[in-house]
A protein has these predicted regions:
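Active-site-proximal, Lys/Arg-enriched surface segment
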Residues: 108-185
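A short, flexible helix-boundary coil/loop motif
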Residues: 7-17, 39, 264-304, 363, ...
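Electropositive, glycine- and tryptophan-enriched low-complexity nucleic-acid-binding patches
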Residues: 168-221, 321
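Short, solvent-exposed helix-loop connector elements
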Residues: 41-48, 338-347, 360-380, 397-401
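Short, conserved catalytic/metal-binding motifs centered on acidic residues
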Residues: 59, 73-74, 103, 107, ...
Length: 435
Protein backbone atom coordinates (compact mmCIF):
# COMPACT_ATOMS: atom_id res chain seq x y z
CA UNK A 1 0.00 0.00 0.00
CA UNK A 2 1.61 3.26 -1.14
CA UNK A 3 1.37 6.53 0.71
CA UNK A 4 -1.02 7.91 -1.94
CA UNK A 5 -3.58 5.23 -1.10
CA UNK A 6 -4.43 6.79 2.25
CA UNK A 7 -6.58 9.23 0.27
CA UNK A 8 -9.87 7.56 -0.68
CA UNK A 9 -11.77 8.07 -3.91
CA UNK A 10 -13.06 11.63 -3.88
CA UNK A 11 -16.65 12.03 -2.76
CA UNK A 12 -16.63 15.82 -2.69
CA UNK A 13 -18.70 16.06 -5.90
CA UNK A 14 -21.65 14.27 -4.35
CA UNK A 15 -23.09 17.42 -2.76
CA UNK A 16 -22.36 16.13 0.73
CA UNK A 17 -19.77 18.71 1.78
CA UNK A 18 -22.17 21.67 2.33
CA UNK A 19 -24.39 19.52 4.56
CA UNK A 20 -21.61 18.35 6.89
CA UNK A 21 -19.86 21.20 8.67
CA UNK A 22 -16.25 20.77 9.77
CA UNK A 23 -17.32 21.95 13.23
CA UNK A 24 -19.03 18.65 14.02
CA UNK A 25 -17.29 16.24 11.63
CA UNK A 26 -14.26 15.81 13.91
CA UNK A 27 -15.67 17.22 17.15
CA UNK A 28 -15.69 13.72 18.68
CA UNK A 29 -11.97 13.33 17.95
CA UNK A 30 -11.16 16.69 19.54
CA UNK A 31 -13.11 15.69 22.65
CA UNK A 32 -11.30 12.34 22.73
CA UNK A 33 -7.90 14.06 22.52
CA UNK A 34 -8.65 16.64 25.21
CA UNK A 35 -10.12 14.02 27.58
CA UNK A 36 -7.09 11.77 27.22
CA UNK A 37 -4.41 14.48 27.34
CA UNK A 38 -5.96 15.99 30.49
CA UNK A 39 -5.32 12.67 32.26
CA UNK A 40 -1.67 12.41 31.21
CA UNK A 41 -0.37 15.39 33.21
CA UNK A 42 1.64 13.28 35.67
CA UNK A 43 3.65 11.60 32.90
CA UNK A 44 6.43 14.08 32.14
CA UNK A 45 7.91 14.05 28.67
CA UNK A 46 11.63 14.32 28.07
CA UNK A 47 12.93 17.82 27.39
CA UNK A 48 14.30 16.77 24.01
CA UNK A 49 11.05 15.06 22.95
CA UNK A 50 9.94 16.39 19.58
CA UNK A 51 6.42 14.94 19.66
CA UNK A 52 3.38 16.27 21.49
CA UNK A 53 0.63 14.12 23.03
CA UNK A 54 -1.62 14.97 20.10
CA UNK A 55 0.90 13.46 17.64
CA UNK A 56 0.58 10.02 19.23
CA UNK A 57 -3.22 10.25 19.34
CA UNK A 58 -3.46 11.25 15.69
CA UNK A 59 -1.58 8.14 14.65
CA UNK A 60 -3.81 6.00 16.87
CA UNK A 61 -7.05 7.51 15.62
CA UNK A 62 -6.03 7.53 11.97
CA UNK A 63 -5.21 3.82 12.26
CA UNK A 64 -8.87 3.27 13.14
CA UNK A 65 -9.94 5.35 10.14
CA UNK A 66 -7.67 3.39 7.81
CA UNK A 67 -8.44 0.02 9.35
CA UNK A 68 -4.70 -0.68 9.58
CA UNK A 69 -2.24 -1.41 12.37
CA UNK A 70 -0.35 1.31 14.26
CA UNK A 71 2.84 0.31 12.44
CA UNK A 72 1.31 0.58 8.96
CA UNK A 73 -0.42 3.86 9.76
CA UNK A 74 2.72 5.43 11.21
CA UNK A 75 4.80 4.50 8.16
CA UNK A 76 2.11 5.58 5.69
CA UNK A 77 1.55 8.96 7.33
CA UNK A 78 5.27 9.57 7.65
CA UNK A 79 5.90 8.73 3.97
CA UNK A 80 2.93 10.85 2.89
CA UNK A 81 3.98 13.98 4.79
CA UNK A 82 7.61 13.65 3.70
CA UNK A 83 6.53 13.34 0.07
CA UNK A 84 4.67 16.65 0.40
CA UNK A 85 7.52 18.54 2.09
CA UNK A 86 10.30 20.31 0.24
CA UNK A 87 13.98 19.99 0.94
CA UNK A 88 16.25 17.13 1.83
CA UNK A 89 15.48 14.74 4.63
CA UNK A 90 17.89 14.96 7.56
CA UNK A 91 20.04 11.85 8.17
CA UNK A 92 21.47 11.27 11.66
CA UNK A 93 25.01 10.03 12.31
CA UNK A 94 23.79 6.49 13.04
CA UNK A 95 21.99 6.28 9.70
CA UNK A 96 18.47 6.95 10.94
CA UNK A 97 16.32 9.38 8.98
CA UNK A 98 14.33 12.18 10.56
CA UNK A 99 10.64 11.35 10.96
CA UNK A 100 7.59 13.60 10.88
CA UNK A 101 5.39 11.02 12.61
CA UNK A 102 6.17 9.07 15.82
CA UNK A 103 7.14 5.43 15.34
CA UNK A 104 4.90 2.52 16.27
CA UNK A 105 6.90 1.68 19.41
CA UNK A 106 6.53 5.23 20.73
CA UNK A 107 2.78 5.29 20.05
CA UNK A 108 2.23 1.95 21.79
CA UNK A 109 4.36 3.02 24.74
CA UNK A 110 2.27 6.18 25.10
CA UNK A 111 -1.05 4.31 24.95
CA UNK A 112 0.04 1.77 27.58
CA UNK A 113 0.36 4.54 30.14
CA UNK A 114 -3.43 4.74 30.22
CA UNK A 115 -4.79 2.32 32.82
CA UNK A 116 -8.12 0.54 32.77
CA UNK A 117 -9.90 2.97 35.11
CA UNK A 118 -8.69 6.00 33.15
CA UNK A 119 -9.83 4.38 29.91
CA UNK A 120 -13.29 3.78 31.43
CA UNK A 121 -13.60 7.42 32.45
CA UNK A 122 -12.45 8.63 29.03
CA UNK A 123 -14.98 6.36 27.31
CA UNK A 124 -17.77 7.60 29.54
CA UNK A 125 -16.86 11.28 28.98
CA UNK A 126 -16.48 11.02 25.19
CA UNK A 127 -19.68 9.06 24.57
CA UNK A 128 -21.64 11.43 26.84
CA UNK A 129 -20.39 14.37 24.79
CA UNK A 130 -21.43 12.71 21.53
CA UNK A 131 -24.90 11.79 22.83
CA UNK A 132 -25.54 15.33 24.08
CA UNK A 133 -24.39 16.70 20.72
CA UNK A 134 -26.90 14.44 18.96
CA UNK A 135 -29.61 15.63 21.36
CA UNK A 136 -28.76 19.32 20.87
CA UNK A 137 -28.81 18.91 17.08
CA UNK A 138 -32.22 17.24 17.16
CA UNK A 139 -30.91 13.92 15.82
CA UNK A 140 -32.38 12.06 18.81
CA UNK A 141 -35.02 12.99 21.37
CA UNK A 142 -34.68 13.12 25.13
CA UNK A 143 -36.91 10.04 25.44
CA UNK A 144 -34.83 7.06 24.35
CA UNK A 145 -34.96 3.29 24.09
CA UNK A 146 -32.00 1.49 25.65
CA UNK A 147 -30.54 -1.67 24.11
CA UNK A 148 -28.32 -3.93 26.25
CA UNK A 149 -26.28 -6.94 25.18
CA UNK A 150 -22.97 -8.76 25.64
CA UNK A 151 -20.14 -9.15 23.16
CA UNK A 152 -17.17 -11.51 23.42
CA UNK A 153 -13.59 -10.97 22.27
CA UNK A 154 -11.44 -14.13 22.13
CA UNK A 155 -8.23 -14.12 24.17
CA UNK A 156 -5.21 -16.22 23.16
CA UNK A 157 -2.67 -15.21 25.82
CA UNK A 158 -1.54 -16.74 29.10
CA UNK A 159 -3.28 -14.42 31.54
CA UNK A 160 -5.41 -16.07 34.19
CA UNK A 161 -7.21 -13.35 36.14
CA UNK A 162 -10.81 -12.25 36.71
CA UNK A 163 -10.96 -10.09 33.57
CA UNK A 164 -10.26 -13.14 31.39
CA UNK A 165 -13.30 -15.43 31.42
CA UNK A 166 -13.90 -18.94 30.12
CA UNK A 167 -15.95 -19.66 27.00
CA UNK A 168 -16.76 -22.45 24.57
CA UNK A 169 -18.00 -20.18 21.78
CA UNK A 170 -14.67 -18.98 20.34
CA UNK A 171 -12.40 -20.65 17.80
CA UNK A 172 -8.99 -21.84 18.94
CA UNK A 173 -9.32 -20.69 22.55
CA UNK A 174 -11.36 -21.21 25.69
CA UNK A 175 -10.74 -17.70 27.02
CA UNK A 176 -12.35 -14.36 26.26
CA UNK A 177 -12.84 -10.76 27.30
CA UNK A 178 -16.51 -10.16 28.13
CA UNK A 179 -17.97 -6.71 27.40
CA UNK A 180 -21.40 -5.39 28.33
CA UNK A 181 -22.57 -2.87 25.73
CA UNK A 182 -25.24 -0.17 25.93
CA UNK A 183 -26.82 1.75 23.06
CA UNK A 184 -29.67 4.19 22.50
CA UNK A 185 -32.39 4.06 19.86
CA UNK A 186 -34.33 7.23 19.17
CA UNK A 187 -35.90 8.62 15.98
CA UNK A 188 -34.58 5.60 14.07
CA UNK A 189 -31.01 6.54 15.03
CA UNK A 190 -28.91 3.94 16.84
CA UNK A 191 -25.96 5.24 18.90
CA UNK A 192 -23.59 3.48 21.29
CA UNK A 193 -23.74 4.93 24.79
CA UNK A 194 -21.51 2.80 27.02
CA UNK A 195 -19.27 -0.22 27.46
CA UNK A 196 -18.06 -2.13 30.48
CA UNK A 197 -15.75 -5.12 30.75
CA UNK A 198 -17.31 -7.70 33.08
CA UNK A 199 -15.07 -9.77 35.34
CA UNK A 200 -15.62 -13.35 36.46
CA UNK A 201 -18.16 -13.47 39.28
CA UNK A 202 -19.16 -9.83 38.81
CA UNK A 203 -22.90 -9.12 38.81
CA UNK A 204 -24.16 -7.28 35.74
CA UNK A 205 -27.27 -5.87 37.46
CA UNK A 206 -25.49 -3.05 39.40
CA UNK A 207 -23.62 -2.08 36.20
CA UNK A 208 -26.89 -1.74 34.27
CA UNK A 209 -28.64 0.20 37.05
CA UNK A 210 -25.68 2.57 37.37
CA UNK A 211 -25.69 3.21 33.62
CA UNK A 212 -29.43 3.92 33.54
CA UNK A 213 -29.06 6.31 36.49
CA UNK A 214 -26.30 8.09 34.59
CA UNK A 215 -28.57 8.48 31.55
CA UNK A 216 -31.22 10.11 33.72
CA UNK A 217 -28.57 12.47 35.13
CA UNK A 218 -27.70 13.53 31.56
CA UNK A 219 -31.32 14.59 31.02
CA UNK A 220 -32.64 11.58 29.11
CA UNK A 221 -35.89 9.76 29.84
CA UNK A 222 -36.38 6.01 29.51
CA UNK A 223 -39.01 4.58 27.19
CA UNK A 224 -38.19 0.91 26.61
CA UNK A 225 -35.22 -1.13 27.79
CA UNK A 226 -34.67 -4.08 25.44
CA UNK A 227 -32.63 -7.01 26.80
CA UNK A 228 -31.96 -10.69 26.18
CA UNK A 229 -33.13 -13.45 28.54
CA UNK A 230 -29.72 -13.58 30.26
CA UNK A 231 -30.79 -10.37 32.07
CA UNK A 232 -33.89 -12.10 33.48
CA UNK A 233 -33.95 -10.59 36.98
CA UNK A 234 -36.91 -9.32 39.00
CA UNK A 235 -34.66 -6.75 40.69
CA UNK A 236 -33.68 -5.23 37.34
CA UNK A 237 -37.23 -5.01 36.00
CA UNK A 238 -38.39 -3.43 39.25
CA UNK A 239 -35.61 -0.81 39.07
CA UNK A 240 -36.37 0.03 35.43
CA UNK A 241 -40.05 0.53 36.22
CA UNK A 242 -39.08 2.81 39.11
CA UNK A 243 -36.99 4.93 36.71
CA UNK A 244 -40.02 5.57 34.50
CA UNK A 245 -39.18 3.06 31.77
CA UNK A 246 -40.60 -0.26 30.64
CA UNK A 247 -38.60 -3.42 30.01
CA UNK A 248 -39.15 -5.88 27.17
CA UNK A 249 -37.41 -9.22 27.58
CA UNK A 250 -37.96 -12.83 26.42
CA UNK A 251 -39.56 -15.06 29.03
CA UNK A 252 -37.83 -18.23 30.16
CA UNK A 253 -39.69 -21.51 29.80
CA UNK A 254 -40.54 -22.02 33.43
CA UNK A 255 -43.45 -24.27 34.44
CA UNK A 256 -45.85 -21.34 34.78
CA UNK A 257 -44.94 -20.03 31.32
CA UNK A 258 -45.42 -23.47 29.77
CA UNK A 259 -48.81 -23.74 31.46
CA UNK A 260 -49.87 -20.34 30.07
CA UNK A 261 -48.88 -21.41 26.53
CA UNK A 262 -50.75 -24.71 26.85
CA UNK A 263 -53.89 -22.98 28.15
CA UNK A 264 -53.75 -20.51 25.25
CA UNK A 265 -53.47 -23.33 22.71
CA UNK A 266 -56.45 -25.05 24.35
CA UNK A 267 -58.49 -21.83 24.16
CA UNK A 268 -58.65 -21.31 27.93
CA UNK A 269 -56.53 -18.13 27.98
CA UNK A 270 -55.81 -15.11 25.77
CA UNK A 271 -52.48 -14.31 24.13
CA UNK A 272 -51.75 -11.69 26.84
CA UNK A 273 -51.59 -12.76 30.49
CA UNK A 274 -50.66 -11.01 33.71
CA UNK A 275 -47.70 -12.66 35.39
CA UNK A 276 -45.84 -12.05 38.64
CA UNK A 277 -42.36 -13.38 39.22
CA UNK A 278 -39.90 -12.72 42.00
CA UNK A 279 -36.32 -13.27 43.01
CA UNK A 280 -35.33 -16.42 44.90
CA UNK A 281 -36.90 -16.99 48.30
CA UNK A 282 -33.47 -17.28 49.96
CA UNK A 283 -32.28 -13.94 48.52
CA UNK A 284 -31.35 -11.18 50.98
CA UNK A 285 -33.72 -8.68 49.37
CA UNK A 286 -36.67 -10.18 47.57
CA UNK A 287 -37.99 -8.28 44.54
CA UNK A 288 -41.34 -8.79 42.82
CA UNK A 289 -42.07 -7.72 39.24
CA UNK A 290 -45.56 -7.52 37.72
CA UNK A 291 -45.39 -8.09 33.98
CA UNK A 292 -47.62 -8.88 31.01
CA UNK A 293 -46.77 -12.04 29.11
CA UNK A 294 -47.25 -11.95 25.32
CA UNK A 295 -47.43 -15.08 23.17
CA UNK A 296 -46.17 -14.57 19.62
CA UNK A 297 -45.73 -16.94 16.67
CA UNK A 298 -42.25 -17.38 15.24
CA UNK A 299 -41.42 -16.18 11.75
CA UNK A 300 -43.14 -18.31 9.11
CA UNK A 301 -46.08 -19.21 11.36
CA UNK A 302 -49.29 -17.52 12.44
CA UNK A 303 -50.56 -17.68 15.99
CA UNK A 304 -54.09 -18.62 14.92
CA UNK A 305 -52.73 -21.26 12.55
CA UNK A 306 -50.64 -22.90 15.27
CA UNK A 307 -53.58 -22.84 17.67
CA UNK A 308 -55.97 -24.29 15.08
CA UNK A 309 -53.61 -27.12 14.06
CA UNK A 310 -53.02 -28.05 17.69
CA UNK A 311 -56.73 -28.18 18.48
CA UNK A 312 -57.35 -30.28 15.36
CA UNK A 313 -54.60 -32.70 16.39
CA UNK A 314 -52.35 -32.03 13.39
CA UNK A 315 -49.38 -31.12 15.62
CA UNK A 316 -48.37 -32.14 19.13
CA UNK A 317 -48.02 -29.84 22.12
CA UNK A 318 -44.22 -30.02 21.80
CA UNK A 319 -44.36 -28.99 18.13
CA UNK A 320 -46.78 -26.17 18.92
CA UNK A 321 -44.48 -24.82 21.64
CA UNK A 322 -41.56 -24.80 19.20
CA UNK A 323 -43.57 -22.57 16.83
CA UNK A 324 -44.29 -19.83 19.38
CA UNK A 325 -42.22 -17.74 21.76
CA UNK A 326 -43.07 -15.56 24.74
CA UNK A 327 -41.89 -12.12 25.74
CA UNK A 328 -42.82 -10.12 28.79
CA UNK A 329 -43.01 -6.41 29.44
CA UNK A 330 -43.69 -4.22 32.43
CA UNK A 331 -45.91 -1.99 30.27
CA UNK A 332 -49.67 -2.27 30.65
CA UNK A 333 -51.76 -3.01 27.53
CA UNK A 334 -52.83 0.09 25.61
CA UNK A 335 -55.81 0.25 23.29
CA UNK A 336 -56.84 -2.97 21.58
CA UNK A 337 -55.00 -5.77 23.35
CA UNK A 338 -54.15 -7.82 20.24
CA UNK A 339 -52.78 -4.79 18.38
CA UNK A 340 -50.73 -3.72 21.39
CA UNK A 341 -49.29 -7.24 21.71
CA UNK A 342 -48.28 -7.29 18.03
CA UNK A 343 -46.68 -3.82 18.20
CA UNK A 344 -44.73 -4.69 21.35
CA UNK A 345 -43.41 -8.01 20.06
CA UNK A 346 -42.42 -6.46 16.71
CA UNK A 347 -40.63 -3.59 18.43
CA UNK A 348 -38.53 -6.05 20.42
CA UNK A 349 -36.88 -7.13 17.15
CA UNK A 350 -34.99 -3.84 17.20
CA UNK A 351 -32.82 -5.25 19.96
CA UNK A 352 -30.86 -6.90 17.16
CA UNK A 353 -29.56 -3.46 16.19
CA UNK A 354 -26.96 -3.58 18.97
CA UNK A 355 -25.75 -6.99 17.73
CA UNK A 356 -25.46 -5.82 14.12
CA UNK A 357 -23.76 -2.73 15.54
CA UNK A 358 -21.09 -4.91 17.13
CA UNK A 359 -20.52 -6.46 13.69
CA UNK A 360 -20.11 -2.96 12.23
CA UNK A 361 -17.52 -2.16 14.90
CA UNK A 362 -15.51 -5.16 13.69
CA UNK A 363 -15.77 -3.89 10.11
CA UNK A 364 -14.08 -0.63 11.08
CA UNK A 365 -10.83 -2.33 12.05
CA UNK A 366 -9.49 -5.74 12.99
CA UNK A 367 -9.45 -6.52 16.70
CA UNK A 368 -6.31 -5.50 18.51
CA UNK A 369 -4.03 -8.12 20.03
CA UNK A 370 -2.84 -5.83 22.82
CA UNK A 371 -2.63 -7.51 26.22
CA UNK A 372 -3.36 -4.19 27.99
CA UNK A 373 -7.01 -3.78 28.99
CA UNK A 374 -6.79 0.02 28.89
CA UNK A 375 -5.56 0.01 25.28
CA UNK A 376 -8.32 -2.41 24.29
CA UNK A 377 -10.84 -0.03 25.86
CA UNK A 378 -9.47 2.90 23.84
CA UNK A 379 -9.69 0.80 20.68
CA UNK A 380 -13.37 0.01 21.36
CA UNK A 381 -14.04 3.66 22.21
CA UNK A 382 -12.56 4.87 18.91
CA UNK A 383 -14.73 2.42 16.98
CA UNK A 384 -17.87 3.47 18.86
CA UNK A 385 -17.14 7.15 18.20
CA UNK A 386 -16.70 6.41 14.48
CA UNK A 387 -19.89 4.31 14.42
CA UNK A 388 -21.87 7.08 16.12
CA UNK A 389 -20.36 9.62 13.72
CA UNK A 390 -21.64 7.55 10.80
CA UNK A 391 -25.17 7.30 12.24
CA UNK A 392 -25.28 11.01 13.13
CA UNK A 393 -24.02 12.15 9.72
CA UNK A 394 -26.50 9.82 8.03
CA UNK A 395 -29.31 11.43 10.03
CA UNK A 396 -28.02 14.92 9.18
CA UNK A 397 -28.11 14.11 5.47
CA UNK A 398 -31.67 12.78 5.71
CA UNK A 399 -33.00 15.83 7.56
CA UNK A 400 -32.92 18.38 4.65
CA UNK A 401 -34.91 16.05 2.37
CA UNK A 402 -38.67 16.44 2.35
CA UNK A 403 -41.03 13.55 2.81
CA UNK A 404 -41.35 11.52 -0.37
CA UNK A 405 -37.90 12.54 -1.61
CA UNK A 406 -35.10 9.98 -1.66
CA UNK A 407 -32.28 10.75 0.77
CA UNK A 408 -28.64 9.74 0.14
CA UNK A 409 -27.75 6.25 1.32
CA UNK A 410 -24.80 7.19 3.54
CA UNK A 411 -22.77 4.03 4.20
CA UNK A 412 -20.13 3.31 6.82
CA UNK A 413 -17.39 3.21 4.16
CA UNK A 414 -18.46 6.58 2.77
CA UNK A 415 -18.35 8.09 6.24
CA UNK A 416 -14.89 6.64 6.87
CA UNK A 417 -13.67 8.04 3.53
CA UNK A 418 -15.07 11.47 4.31
CA UNK A 419 -13.47 11.50 7.75
CA UNK A 420 -10.09 10.55 6.24
CA UNK A 421 -10.27 13.47 3.80
CA UNK A 422 -11.16 15.90 6.59
CA UNK A 423 -8.62 14.44 9.01
CA UNK A 424 -5.75 14.59 6.49
CA UNK A 425 -6.70 18.11 5.42
CA UNK A 426 -6.45 19.35 9.02
CA UNK A 427 -3.23 17.38 9.53
CA UNK A 428 -1.61 18.95 6.46
CA UNK A 429 -2.48 22.45 7.65
CA UNK A 430 -1.01 21.69 11.07
CA UNK A 431 2.28 20.46 9.59
CA UNK A 432 2.49 23.21 7.01
CA UNK A 433 2.36 20.84 4.06
CA UNK A 434 2.45 22.50 0.66
CA UNK A 435 -0.36 21.16 -1.54
Amino acid sequence: MTCNNIFPISILRSGIKPLLSNDHILSFYKKFSSALISRMWKFKRAKNSRYEDSDFLRVFFFSELLGRSIHDTSELLNAYLLSKKRGRRKIFSDGRRKREIPHQTEVNKYLRKIGLQKARNILRECLDKQLLEALDNGLISSKVNVLIDFTEHPYYGRRDDRLIKGTNRQKGTKKMRHYLGFSLLSRDTHLYAGLRQVATGQSKIPIIIKFLDHLLDLGFELKYVLMDREFYRAELLDEIKGMGGDAIIPAKNYKTIKRFVKEYLEGKRGRVSSYTFSSAVEARCRFIAHVNLIIKAKRGFSLRGVKRKYQQGEITLKEARHRVFTIMTTQKPRGKESSWASRTSLFYRRRWMIETGFSDLNRINRRWKSNHDGVRYLDMLARMLLYNSWKMNKKRLQTPHKKGMSSPNWTLNQNQDFLRVTFLSDYEKLHGVVG
